[in-house]
């Protein structure tokens, strides 16, 4: 049983009231957040008000809705009406949206308890959470290490048990990588399965919201709720087919699990070994492991950085100090104001990507970079399409390594970009992928593997992930932090 | 040396949809600043555009009305530039795959001004300067526009005027815009170059931005033509630049040169899906289009014998031509109705706005009734005219003013009799007429008119007498 079901049954049985539960989490946040730095905004008033409503509902003898009464958190790039949404950037400090993101509207309707907003790399640009203007979130397994990024705050909070689940966003691995670093589960849904309405855009054609949880069941439950069709997001189709929860325990005997050889290149030995060990477990369960080649993978990283930066340079043009957010104090004229506001408001990594993106879209370079990258995107999509003609899911490492120490990521940007090598192809192809813990290195830091599916096959990858979780519960470990139920 | 003018137009037209292109805010003109706004059209972080289907439909109508090809697949692109009135720092427009391709606008000379394409896009907000400060009003931000881009086919300033007027006329006919230049719902940019007459090579062009009246367009083009010719004749070179026209001084001045031209970094907008339009959908929209003014004009002239100048007046606004079409359904001589509209009715509809609205008390059916009396020879023209004046004032039918008695006895056989009598009574005049003195026949006419108490139709009588004599 996952944590969500456990909490809901405790609430329903009267073992604990929702207000008590919420207070427990709020207290745990107070104790742990100084070191984990997972939350950037805590919302006790919102949480306790919601909790009261849940308790009244229980008193009236009503049945709880999915996720109702469950304390959770949202990444700070998901718009929350009246609650600061900063993307952990100085340029949006103090900005309170006047509308709700679709996913928050759904969760609110279901009375999931919002504990607060969590830390992230500035505008989701980064792999360590350290580009946050609030400083990075740390890893609950060892706070000398980063939580990963960009959804580092959610992963740190869920891994540290100061939230039951959280929603992050994944543009090039930002859900899966921190989930992998923090030893928990992160689902990046198919592009278009979850509404992006209200998610502050980084790279619109790659961004996707998804759950970060401690167990596969929880990821499935959250995904089933948030994957609603939304007419306000033209690219959103919602979940296709039955709830993923219904098929979690399906037999995987005879299923073909593919391993692309390219995915094991340049991966650290301990990570590779853990993934291959997982493959052996699947064989024991009756699945067939199929090795194949995916040469198009070598284009993924440059394609990702060209497309993501190009879109970002356009998406981030609106932060000019005129309508909301940070505005420079001293300026002469509008041009000066916009220049100073942006120079002072954006951090280094964001500026680097805006410049890069502006460059690849400019006249004379568009064909050589942006257009070429778009064409190669087509090549990568096709390569995965072909692969899924022969296999049901693909098994791969989530990150080529385990969580690095704080400060290590920021020294060399290109080196850091390489850590995204396993995750970005999935965003480029718009596929679903779930990262699941599959072991620990000799220092006790978690290792993650991802199970990648064809479009809208969330049900299948969660099924495969669940079977592994059942077989290897030892890889799903608690840390010393937070609420123990 | 003589120089030829070469000009092309980029015309922005605001579409008359109820709501904006990417949100459900009102497009109504005016309103308190920022009162027609929502998170989407002020570009708050995280918001996404949702394409208004009506905008696509209106764009297709514009394309069909200008004989363009409707693209089955078109896409939205982002045009990136930073200006405070543009809330997202990019305008959602179309560059790589516009909604309609090609087409033309036909001038009265028969010359066709070819169109390159028509695309849909969003308008920007407005800056308001007041008390030394600058404010932004986003009410207009997100109002749908079409941009009609012509080929450089215009050679004379008069052609430019007619081109703009024709566009206005057609867009109003199909009901997609009111095209009011003074309110900014139609704005023109003109590209101008000159070249020695007979030369095939295009000269360097300048672009005059954002003109908001036809007379300004004509004056600006005239000025710019002269300026370029002077420059070349004095050994200078035209520089590619964007100009602003100042109507107070009647001059153009530079806004920016080619060197500091914007690099808009166009790319496909990832927030919007491909616009797919099937041939069936195009056909369906086509079937809702009214007959277009050029077709109407041709029909009036060739089928009804309406003089060209009158046909132009009748087709200038859709309401007039529709009134005319209704009034003449079963008339043998539609020209009678046309004369009444242009004579009697235009006299009381003095402004262009009045003519466009064409709000008259007399219904087309009532006009038809009156015309039929004339055709039946029951009422003579002068009487009909004065009757129509009364009808227009009261809204009552003609039978209110023309009595049975007025119409009695004027059937054809009675007039025939009178004509015969007239010939018998004026043998001398008949003789003279036969010898070629046309005017002599007026004596017989006078006889008939007098004995019919002025009720006979003069034209009919003349023809009758002539045929009886010969
Ligand atoms: Zn709006």
Identify the role of each PLM range.
Chain B
Residues 377-378:
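Extended, charged alpha-helical coiled-coil/arm scaffolds that mediate oligomerization and mechanical coupling
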Residues 438-470:
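Short, amphipathic C-terminal "tail helix"
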């Amino acid at each position: 049983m996952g944590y969500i079901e456990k909490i809901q049954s405790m609430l329903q049985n009267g073992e604990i009231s929702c207000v008590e539960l919420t207070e427990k989490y709020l207290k745990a946040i107070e104790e742990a957040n100084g070191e984990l730095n997972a939350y950037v905004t805590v919302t006790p008033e919102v949480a306790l008000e919601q909790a009261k409503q849940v308790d009244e509902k229980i008193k009236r003898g009503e049945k709880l809705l999915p996720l109702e009464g469950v304390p959770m958190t949202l990444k700070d790039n998901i718009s929350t009406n009246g609650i600061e949404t900063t993307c952990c950037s100085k340029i949006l400090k103090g900005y309170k949206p006047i509308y709700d993101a679709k996913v928050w509207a759904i969760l609110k309707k279901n009375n999931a308890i919002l504990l607060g907003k969590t830390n992230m790399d500035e505008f989701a640009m980064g792999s360590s959470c350290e580009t946050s203007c609030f400083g990075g979130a740390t890893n609950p397994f060892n706070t000398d290490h980063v939580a990963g990024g960009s959804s580092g705050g959610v992963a740190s909070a869920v891994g540290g048990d100061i939230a039951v689940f959280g929603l992050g966003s994944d543009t090039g691995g930002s859900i899966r990588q921190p989930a992998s670093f923090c030893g928990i589960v992160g689902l990046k849904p198919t592009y278009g399965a979850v509404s992006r309405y209200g998610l502050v855009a980084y790279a619109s054609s790659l961004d996707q919201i998804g759950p970060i949880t401690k167990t596969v069941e929880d990821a499935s439950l959250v995904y089933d709720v948030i994957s609603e069709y939304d007419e306000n997001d033209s690219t959103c189709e919602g979940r296709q087919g039955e709830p993923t929860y219904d098929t979690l325990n399906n037999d995987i005997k005879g299923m073909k699990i593919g391993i692309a050889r390219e995915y094991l290149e340049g991966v650290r030995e301990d990570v590779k070994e853990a993934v291959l060990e997982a493959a052996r477990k699947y064989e024991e369960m009756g699945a067939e492991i199929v090795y194949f080649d995916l040469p198009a993978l070598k284009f993924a990283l440059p394609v990702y950085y060209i497309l993501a930066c190009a879109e970002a340079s356009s998406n981030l043009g609106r932060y000019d100090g005129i309508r909301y957010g940070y505005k420079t104090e001293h300026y002469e004229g509008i041009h000066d104001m916009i220049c100073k506001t942006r120079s002072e408001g954006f951090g280094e990594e964001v500026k680097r990507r805006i410049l890069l993106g502006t460059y690849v879209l400019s006249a004379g370079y568009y064909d050589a970079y942006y257009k070429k990258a778009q064409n190669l995107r087509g090549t990568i999509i096709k390569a995965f399409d072909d692969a899924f003609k022969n296999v049901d899911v693909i098994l791969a490492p989530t990150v080529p390594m385990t969580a690095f120490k704080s400060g290590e990521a920021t020294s060399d940007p290109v080196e850091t970009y390489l850590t995204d090598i396993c995750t970005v192809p999935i965003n480029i192809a718009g596929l679903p992928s779930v990262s699941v813990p599959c072991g620990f290195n000799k220092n006790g830091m978690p290792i993650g593997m991802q199970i990648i599916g064809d479009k809208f096959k969330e049900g299948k990858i969660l099924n495969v992930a669940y079977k592994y979780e059942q077989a290897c519960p030892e890889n799903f470990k608690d840390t010393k932090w937070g609420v123990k139920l | 040396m003589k120089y030829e003018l070469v000009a092309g137009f980029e015309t922005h037209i605001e579409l008359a949809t109820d709501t904006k292109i990417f949100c459900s805010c009102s497009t109504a003109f005016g309103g308190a600043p920022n009162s027609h706004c929502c998170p989407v059209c002020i570009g708050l972080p995280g918001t996404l555009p949702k394409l208004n289907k009506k905008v696509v439909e209106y764009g297709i109508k514009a394309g069909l009305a200008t004989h363009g090809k409707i693209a089955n697949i078109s896409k939205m692109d982002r045009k990136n530039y930073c200006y405070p009135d543009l809330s997202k720092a990019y305008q959602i427009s179309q560059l790589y795959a516009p909604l309609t391709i090609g087409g033309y606008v036909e001038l009265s000379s028969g010359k066709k001004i070819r169109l390159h394409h028509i695309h849909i896009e969003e308008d920007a907000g407005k800056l308001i300067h007041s008390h030394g400060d600058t404010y932004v009003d986003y009410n207009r931000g997100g109002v749908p526009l079409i941009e009609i881009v012509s080929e450089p086919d215009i050679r004379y300033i008069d052609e430019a005027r007619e081109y703009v007027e024709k566009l206005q006329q057609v867009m109003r006919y199909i009901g997609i815009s009111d095209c009011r230049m003074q309110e900014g719902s139609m704005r023109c940019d003109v590209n101008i170059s000159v070249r020695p007459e007979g030369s095939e090579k295009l000269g360097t062009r300048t672009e005059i931005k954002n003109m908001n009246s036809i007379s300004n367009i004509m004056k600006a083009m005239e000025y710019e033509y002269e300026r370029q010719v002077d420059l070349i004749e004095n050994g200078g070179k035209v520089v590619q630049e964007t100009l602003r026209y100042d109507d107070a001084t009647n001059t153009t001045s530079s806004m920016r040169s080619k060197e500091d031209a914007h690099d808009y970094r166009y790319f496909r907008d990832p927030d919007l899906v491909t616009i797919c339009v099937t041939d069936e959908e195009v056909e369906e929209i086509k079937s809702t289009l009214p007959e277009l003014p050029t077709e109407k004009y041709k029909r009036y002239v060739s089928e009804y014998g309406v003089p060209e100048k009158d046909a132009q007046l009748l087709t200038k606004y859709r309401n007039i031509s529709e009134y005319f079409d209704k009034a003449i359904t079963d008339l043998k001589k539609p020209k009678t109705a046309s004369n009444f509209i242009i004579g009697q009715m235009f006299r009381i509809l003095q402004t262009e706005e009045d003519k466009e609205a064409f709000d008259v008390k007399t219904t087309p059916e009532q006009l038809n009734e009156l015309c039929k009396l004339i055709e039946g020879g029951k009422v003579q023209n002068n009487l009909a005219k004065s009757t129509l004046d009364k009808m227009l004032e009261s809204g009552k039918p003609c039978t209110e003013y023309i009595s049975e008695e007025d119409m009695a006895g004027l059937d054809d056989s009675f007039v025939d009799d009178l004509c015969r009598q007239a010939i018998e009574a004026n043998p001398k005049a008949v003789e003279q007429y036969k010898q070629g003195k046309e005017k002599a026949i007026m004596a017989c006419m006078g006889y008939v008119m007098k004995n019919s108490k002025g009720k006979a139709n003069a034209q009919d009588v003349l023809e009758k007498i002539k045929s009886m004599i010969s």
